[in-house]
Amino acid sequence: MKIIKIWFKGDYLYGEDDSGKTYRQSLLWYKKLRSATAEEREQYTFGFDGIHWRNIDEDVSFESFAYNDAEPTKLQRFFLSHPEINIAEFARLIGMNPSLLRNYINGFKKPSKEREQMIIQKVNNIGKEYMALA
């Protein structure tokens, strides 16, 4: 597959391939693109296997448009939307290996339903603690 046209709308990067099929993926996967200005986003080049934004040093492969997980899970969305959270410290708090939690967040590994619920429950508990301060 080769993407021949791209555009941005809301929190998504869209791409159209050479057969006319449209794909989309969340900008949460691409922190630099997400925070880039419209002008910076327009300064890209197509390469052999992807798209490159030299000014912001970001790359998006053509194949990433066809990934099954182009949309972050609830767990991924939370952590990708809150980069201020120290993943290593949060992992230690819940008794988890920090590398494993990073792999869950980045989509390299998938947690079991039980593990995902446990992580989300701890996030909710911390949120309740913050709300108690209000």
PLM feature spans:
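Motif-centric detector for short Cys/His coordination patterns
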Residues: 1-134
